[in-house]
């Protein structure tokens, strides 16, 4: 497996020490414009990007960037620049979760789909208890000119690879390995014992088409079978964690594209766009491996970092406002992180 500690420290060594903070060994906060800061990150070194950029449509003056653009197109152009950098720094088997408003959802997806396969659009509902449901109960319904936006969106995506939604980095690699050692999909299926119910290529053809992924045990069988035929040592086989996009859910998690998490209740020093830890943990647990590197390019008060630490991941947080950088540092220094893995 890739030496994540080495990769993590190598990434951090590229940042100016005057703007880099390490409140914990596996949590780093970098102050500055994340669009510029990302240029210092080596290509294909981040496992998961979980981030909450300005929504633009909400037009809140207390959120940096929310009132920056007068035209929608200018905001979308700006976000497209982020998408280009996200794709460059993300591992081939990495994933992204990007928060957005329901009003800008489709326009953003149109831009993101140039570089990413859109795997899901998650609707985050907010089943808050009475008294903690914001303006939903208090507002005058007769003044509404559209349906009240009681939910938010999270676009879940992975780097585009090929011309089809299901094409994957692993599928393309498996096909190229087979061609190098001259073994058919049918023969490899027989050797691994992974028979398909429909097509004659069995599971191998499904894996190459991106309709399914092998288990860890199946991947080991694939590699062993290919190594026997790779007599000239032409192929360098990556570990499972470095080629298979993680997606790990179970019955204890929210596993549909509707997520029900209460919002963060008001407290002194709360970030105006703060997201709940349990929601962030749901995404991190599903789409990363233990010890992976999680990046948040709009980190606010450091919630993503706290969630990542609780699950045994490393985090890099980027924040442009000094006020929130200091709040994040204080938060991560003082918070007793309880590992949940």
Identify the residue ranges that each predicted region occupies:
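Core catalytic lobe of class I
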Residues: 1-10, 14-318, 323-325
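Conserved phosphoryl-transfer catalytic core
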Residues: 76, 333-339
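Charged C-terminal helix
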Residues: 324, 340-341
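Conserved SAM-binding loop
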Residues: 328-329
């Amino acid at each position: 497996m890739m030496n994540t500690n080495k990769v993590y420290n190598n990434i951090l060594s590229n940042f100016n020490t005057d703007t880099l903070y390490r409140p914990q060994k596996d949590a780093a906060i970098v102050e500055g414009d994340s669009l510029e800061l990302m240029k210092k990150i080596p290509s294909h070194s981040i496992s998961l990007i979980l981030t909450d950029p300005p929504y633009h449509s909400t037009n809140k003056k207390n959120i940096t960037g929310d009132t920056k653009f007068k035209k929608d197109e200018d905001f979308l152009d700006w976000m497209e620049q982020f998408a280009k950098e996200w794709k460059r720094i993300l591992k081939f088997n990495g994933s992204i979760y990007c928060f957005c408003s329901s009003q800008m959802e489709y326009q953003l997806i149109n831009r993101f789909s140039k570089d990413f396969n859109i795997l899901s659009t998650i609707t985050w509902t907010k089943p808050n208890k009475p008294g903690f449901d914001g303006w939903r109960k208090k507002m005058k319904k007769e003044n509404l000119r559209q349906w009240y936006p009681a939910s938010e969106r999270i676009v879940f995506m992975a780097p585009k690879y090929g011309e089809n939604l299901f094409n994957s980095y692993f599928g393309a690699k498996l096909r190229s390995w087979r061609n190098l050692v001259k073994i058919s999909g049918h023969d490899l299926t027989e050797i691994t014992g992974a028979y398909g119910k429909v097509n004659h290529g069995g599971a191998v053809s499904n894996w190459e088409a991106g309709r399914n992924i092998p288990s860890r045990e199946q991947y080991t069988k694939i590699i062993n079978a290919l190594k026997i035929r790779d007599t000239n040592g032409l192929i360098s086989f990556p570990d499972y964690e470095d080629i298979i996009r993680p997606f790990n859910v179970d019955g204890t998690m929210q596993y549909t594209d509707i997520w029900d998490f209460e919002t963060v209740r008001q407290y002194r020093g709360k970030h105006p766009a703060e997201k709940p830890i349990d929601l962030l943990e749901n995404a991190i647990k599903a789409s990363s491996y233990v010890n992976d590197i999680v990046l948040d390019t709009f980190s606010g008060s450091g919630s993503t970092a706290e969630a990542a630490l609780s699950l045994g991941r490393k985090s890099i947080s980027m924040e442009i406002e000094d006020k929130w950088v200091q709040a994040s540092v204080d938060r991560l220094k003082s918070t007793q992180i309880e590992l949940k893995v």
